[in-house]
Amino acid sequence: MKAIGAPADLPVLMGDLAAQAREAARSLGLASTAQKNEALDAMARAIRSNAAAILQANAQDVADARAGGATAAFLDRLTLTQARVEAMADGVKVVREIDDPVGRVTERWQRPNGMTIERVRVPLGVVAVIFESRPNVCADAGVLCLKSGNAVILRGGSESFRSCRAIHACLVEGLREARLPEAAITLVPTRDRAAVGLLLSGMNGGIDVIVPRGGKSLVARVEAEARVPVFAHLEGVNHVYVDGAADLAMAKAVVLNSKMRRPGVCGAAETLLVDRSGVRDILKPLVEALIEAGCEVRGDSDVQGVDPRVRSAADSDWNTEYGDAIISARVVDGCGGAIDHIQRHGSRHTDAIVTEDPETAARFLNEVDSAIVLHNASTQFADGGEFGFGAEIGIATGKFHARGPVGAEQLTSFKYRVHGDGQVRP
């Protein structure tokens, strides 16, 4: 795929891409499950056989990002390893094995006049995915849209441009082998930032939904400017509340994993809340464990009182998605205090409680208004793959259509099929 350089060419290029994607969506929406699975099998093989080329392209992207002063968390999101490429190919195979949502009859009923009505899942059409540093999004979005019968236009960040081109070539190879239109998975072949604005315009009806994957500024721009529906979350200010009735060993494991497994992912915990009754027996060992794991802790006066290494938290810390090995910590008055804090400062993404008290857990799960709420489990399970969706195209925190991990099923809509035998309305 040849990249263009002249901005004057861009509207023409993008218009052509959208038109080709729309035409491909018509074919893909009618493709059989077997044909889509054939493409997915070929994509997984292509990713594995081209791993060296993918890693070489990624190494160039990482070198440029490092030279440009990128943070450690950003570099982690950008970097591919042999293991991550293998995981990417494995993810394609997992999507291959999930049920095809297209054509599934979700409801059927008969009216008194004899008509039978069916509610049937259908593709959305053309999905535009705008993402930044994570090259694996290219594969995840491509294969999920394929499985759900949607064409997709991928616009990756300039930092991951080479990596995405290498991955996209593998996806196109799979489409070709399965005799599906190559425009079903399209990568915008330019770094020109104006391409984002054109996608947000909806391309004169060429795009049905937009999914942004990236930092707060990108998502905020998409939500403000998009002229088509958006599946997105603005940020992941996620909390772990450790109740006074928590098991300490479990709390340590959950808190450390929630924050430190991969601090830069959107499911990482950013704030630790601890029941006031557990300041001595629970809070102190949790803070020590976090600091020893290399995490900076910023806390209120109660948290500072248990360890002199804790830095003072500013008001802004409670609303911050660090994306790094930093966590804010606060003592709260029980489950109610935790819920109040999350209501004021949370982003309705993912929040967890650690407790052995089932009534307290039930209250937290019922009252915290987030897309994902967990009991005695890490916030880093906020992932479509962990939900059994095969992969995810993103996590949505809105309340219309899709909420939580957006997998293949969430990338479909529905229509009604009505069967009659000559009925007319009186």
Curated annotation (Swiss-Prot):
Gene3D superfamilies: Aldehyde Dehydrogenase, Chain A, domain 1 (3.40.605.10), Aldehyde Dehydrogenase, Chain A, domain 2 (3.40.309.10). PROSITE patterns: PROA. It holds the Pfam family Aldedh. Its EC number is 1.2.1.41. The keyword NADP applies. Coiled coil: none annotated. Pathway: Amino-acid biosynthesis; L-proline biosynthesis; L-glutamate 5-semialdehyde from L-glutamate: step 2/2. GO terms for biological process: L-proline biosynthetic process. The keyword Nucleus does not apply. It is found in: Cytoplasm. One of its GO terms (cellular component) is cytoplasm. It catalyses: L-glutamate 5-semialdehyde + phosphate + NADP(+) = L-glutamyl 5-phosphate + NADPH + H(+). Its main location: cytoplasm. It is an enzyme of class 1 (oxidoreductase). Keywords: Amino-acid biosynthesis, Cytoplasm, NADP, Oxidoreductase, Proline biosynthesis. GO terms for molecular function: glutamate-5-semialdehyde dehydrogenase activity; NADP binding. Belongs to the gamma-glutamyl phosphate reductase family. Catalyzes the NADPH-dependent reduction of L-glutamate 5-phosphate into L-glutamate 5-semialdehyde and phosphate. The product spontaneously undergoes cyclization to form 1-pyrroline-5-carboxylate. This is Gamma-glutamyl phosphate reductase. It comes from Nitrobacter winogradskyi (strain ATCC 25391 / DSM 10237 / CIP 104748 / NCIMB 11846 / Nb-255).
